[in-house]
Amino acid sequence: MSANYIEVQIFGQVLRFHCPPDQQENLLASAQRLEERVALLKDQSGIIQLEKVLTIVALNLNYELEQEKQKNANNKAVLESCIHQLDNSLSKLLSGSSVAINQESV
């Protein structure tokens, strides 16, 4: 097998993917987590049709991804506000004005 390809067994099927060597461990771990989530959902819900379970797992993963994107956007906004406040404080300090630190956004 070429160094850029990896075989992953998932749901009893062997799948072959093009994957850079430095990402192969992550791909294997992702496949394992997917199998675990599918198995857990099958056990909890009683749904036996793989397509339905995969659809629900995919929706759950996408929902979690969107939540993380929103958290990242919120964190970015807070950091940008802090940077802006620090920049203003430094400008005032360098110009000799008194500096008041606003801790509301921290």
From Swiss-Prot:
InterPro entries: Cell_div_ZapA-like (IPR007838), Cell_div_ZapA-like_sf (IPR036192), Cell_div_ZapA_N (IPR042233). One of its GO terms (biological process) is division septum assembly. Keywords: Cell cycle, Cell division, Coiled coil, Cytoplasm, Septation. It comes from the Bacteria. GO terms for cellular component: cell division site; cell septum; cytosol. Residues 22-81 form a coiled coil. It is found in: Cytoplasm. Homodimer. Interacts with FtsZ. Activator of cell division through the inhibition of FtsZ GTPase activity, therefore promoting FtsZ assembly into bundles of protofilaments necessary for the formation of the division Z ring. It is recruited early at mid-cell but it is not essential for cell division. Belongs to the ZapA family. Type 1 subfamily. This is Cell division protein ZapA. It comes from Actinobacillus pleuropneumoniae serotype 3 (strain JL03). The gene is zapA.
